[in-house]
């Protein structure tokens, strides 16, 4: 087993997660099985109760573990399935050691940080490194990311553990990559290497010497700066890797390859890589990176959320949208809308902000209502669901988004004006969303319905979402929720047009809803974003993107296969315009008329649909129409339909 430890210096958030994932991507391209471990030196047992504003999203694994969002990077980059033990926290280690002490395993010894805590860390790493993460084969390389920065007091037991670990596994099996910031002050315009020198000095003072120094900078670093770091940090010039800010994280593995990382690791860790037998993995990454640069036609998606001030709160949602947009050959434009800004209270207190946010929502091509907890902003989510339903706007709801859609439908279609969730109003007369029996109110951590669960489609179901998945009988997706749709109201909801197209295996929990006579109004109780991959986008997200650019019907007609041109990284606006014009001319020749029988331009459709704004309830009517632009008049495409 080979180990690569990735540490950080100067500041946190310097990009260790992406660097660690890129190491794994490069090694996988050499046909090596790779696993990852993330170490978080906080005392929490897991990330389940973290505030999204402080740590970003909580990522959920197959086994129900609530972990740091960096594990999502590992799974997406490497296309592997990690487990709860792949995330180590100080809390887990101390809990393990204390439990051993209580059961007498230390035979009366004084339990100390060294050796008991450090030994527990090393044993945990060795055990988890052997756990298969892709199929049944054991990994050959383990990438370990140590969270925080070198010198943090909470991380010192882990640094000491790895100081010992390098001798435990021998030098040829252990490598340290140190990621450090090289700032570029505007006053001088010159890269400063002193922070990196100090960081490396501190790392060496702890007993670890970096084999690779990965310099993060705003702009590319010149050879002179690279040689200076090499000289003062006692490493060879080929051991200094410069990663500047890039347009896409998909470029990072490619840049590291150009810097000779594979060759260095092959020699340093004695990997015996046969360069002639490398897989096409990196070619896929090259295509993906190139496509991010060449795609020009945009699709705008409004994320109506509760934590939009911190983008990492929706990290997996954003990644899933990016995967789907690239697959559909579109450039993603995200429109973050704080759901509380869509509520009546904002209209009274800040009318200009209220109208502005509603206008941004109306101008978007599609809407996504993600998950969340608590009452704040819930009414805004419900209003967004209503607008999407009444105005035929493509929408995807996730978790709380499904619950908001059900409550809105019950209020405005069933006439149950007090419909609500017991999370917000425990005394409501019409509890459309109720607490699950598994939820223990005395404890928050680990009490939700978590992890991968089976979702079964209804017999004879021909729904859009089922077709997007390939018409299976069932699917498996990851869950994270404490509340569910009240099954008592399902018959009433279905009678008025809301279809519950999938349930859990016991047919008691509603998992997916769709609306009849709507281009794309889908909501899931599970979180499809967790299983989206760059080369395998999540079906619900792909459906949202395609519906938002009027391509979903064609995609379904093709058997849910993207056209070669959509999968190409060389598509352009001119090419699509040419293809559309060619097909238009053919239709003219066939019909013998001056206008194709179905040749209604999208702009014409917009004009005819601009009146739909009047269907919005009176309290939000002026928000979308008051500034003179209808909800579907400016969605950023501006071209006639060229059906594929």
Curated annotation (Swiss-Prot):
* Superkingdom in the source lineage: Eukaryota
Q: Name one GO biological process term.
A: pyrimidine nucleobase biosynthetic process
The UniProt keywords, alphabetically, are: ATP-binding, Glutamine amidotransferase, Ligase, Nucleotide-binding, Pyrimidine biosynthesis
Q: Where are the catalytic residues?
A: 399, 527, 529
**Reaction catalysis annotation:** UTP + L-glutamine + ATP + H2O = CTP + L-glutamate + ADP + phosphate + 2 H(+)
Q: What class of enzyme is it?
A: ligase
Task: Supply one GO CC term from the record.
Answer: cytoophidium
Q: Which residues does the UniProt record annotate as the domain Glutamine amidotransferase type-1?
A: 300-551
Q: Which GO terms describe its molecular function?
A: ATP binding; CTP synthase activity; identical protein binding
> In the Enzyme Commission scheme, what number(s) does this protein have?
6.3.4.2
- Pathway membership of this protein? Pyrimidine metabolism; CTP biosynthesis via de novo pathway; CTP from UDP: step 2/2
| Membership in a protein family | Belongs to the CTP synthase family.
Which NCBIfam families does the record cross-reference, listed alphabetically? PRK05380.1, PyrG
Q: What does this protein do?
A: Catalyzes the ATP-dependent amination of UTP to CTP with either L-glutamine or ammonia as the source of nitrogen. Constitutes the rate-limiting enzyme in the synthesis of cytosine nucleotides.
Name of the protein in its database record:
CTP synthase
Species this protein is from: Drosophila pseudoobscura pseudoobscura (Fruit fly)
Recite the lineage of the species. Answer: Eukaryota, Metazoa, Ecdysozoa, Arthropoda, Hexapoda
Q: Which gene encodes it?
A: Ctps
């Amino acid at each position: 087993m080979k180990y690569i430890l990735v540490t950080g210096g100067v500041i946190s958030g310097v990009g260790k997660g992406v660097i660690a994932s890129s190491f794994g991507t490069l090694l996988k391209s050499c046909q090596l099985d790779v696993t990852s471990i993330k170490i978080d030196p906080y005392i929490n047992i897991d990330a389940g109760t973290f505030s999204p504003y402080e740590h970003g999203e909580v990522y959920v694994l197959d086994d129900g573990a609530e972990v740091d969002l960096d594990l999502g990077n590992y799974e997406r980059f490497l296309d592997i399935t990690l487990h709860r033990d792949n995330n180590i926290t100080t809390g887990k280690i101390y809990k393990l050691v204390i439990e051993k002490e209580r059961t007498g395993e230390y035979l009366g010894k004084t339990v100390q940080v060294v050796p008991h805590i450090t030994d527990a860390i090393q044993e945990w790493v060795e055990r988890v490194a052997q756990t298969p993460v892709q199929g049944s084969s054991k990994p050959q390389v383990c990438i370990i990311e140590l969270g925080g920065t070198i010198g943090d007091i909470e991380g010192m037991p882990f640094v000491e553990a790895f100081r010992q670990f390098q001798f435990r596994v021998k030098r040829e099996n252990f490598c340290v990559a140190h990621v450090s910031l090289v700032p570029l002050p505007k006053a001088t315009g010159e890269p400063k290497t002193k922070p990196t020198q100090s960081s490396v000095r501190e790392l060496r003072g702890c007993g670890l010497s970096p084999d690779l120094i990965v310099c993060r900078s705003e702009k590319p670093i010149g050879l002179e700066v690279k040689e200076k770091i090499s000289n003062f940090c006692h490493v060879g010039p080929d051991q200094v890797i410069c990663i500047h800010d890039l347009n896409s994280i998909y470029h990072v593995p490619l840049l590291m390859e150009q810097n000779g990382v594979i060759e260095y690791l092959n020699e340093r860790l004695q990997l015996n890589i046969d360069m002639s037998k490398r897989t096409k993995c990196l070619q896929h990454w090259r295509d993906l990176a190139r496509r991010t640069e060449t795609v020009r036609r945009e699709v705008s998606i409004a994320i109506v959320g509760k934590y939009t001030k911190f983008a990492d709160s929706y990290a997996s949602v954003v990644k899933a949208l990016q995967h789907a947009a690239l697959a559909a050959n579109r450039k993603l434009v995200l429109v973050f809308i704080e759901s509380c800004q869509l509520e009546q209270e904002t209209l009274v207190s800040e009318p200009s902000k209220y109208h502005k946010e509603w206008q941004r929502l109306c101008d978007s091509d599609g809407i996504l209502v993600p998950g969340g907890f608590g009452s704040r902003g819930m009414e805004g989510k419900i209003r967004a669901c209503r607008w999407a339903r009444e105005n035929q706007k493509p929408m995807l709801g996730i978790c709380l988004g499904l619950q908001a859609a059900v409550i809105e439908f019950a209020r405005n279609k069933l006439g149950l004006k007090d419909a609500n969730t017991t999370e917000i109003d425990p005394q409501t007369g019409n509890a459309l969303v109720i607490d699950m029996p598994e939820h223990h109110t005395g404890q928050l951590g680990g009490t939700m319905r978590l992890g991968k669960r089976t979702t079964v489609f209804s017999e004879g179901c021909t729904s859009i979402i089922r077709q997007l998945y390939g018409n299976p009988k069932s699917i498996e997706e990851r869950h994270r929720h404490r509340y569910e749709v009240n099954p008592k109201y399902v018959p009433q909801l279905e009678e008025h047009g809301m279809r519950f197209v999938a349930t859990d295996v016991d047919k008691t929990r509603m998992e997916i809803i769709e609306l009849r006579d709507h281009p794309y109004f889908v909501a899931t109780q599970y979180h499809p974003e967790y299983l989206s991959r760059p080369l395998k986008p999540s079906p619900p997200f792909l459906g949202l993107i395609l519906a938002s650019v009027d391509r979903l019907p064609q995609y379904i007609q093709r058997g849910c296969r993207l056209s070669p041109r959509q999968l190409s990284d060389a598509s352009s606006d001119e090419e699509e315009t040419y293809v559309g014009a060619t097909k238009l001319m053919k239709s003219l020749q066939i019909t013998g008329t001056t206008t194709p029988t179905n040749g209604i331009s999208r702009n014409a459709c917009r004009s005819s649909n601009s009146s739909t704004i009047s269907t919005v309830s009176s309290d939000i009517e002026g928000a979308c129409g008051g500034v003179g632009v209808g909800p579907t008049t400016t969605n950023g495409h501006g071209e006639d339909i060229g059906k594929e």
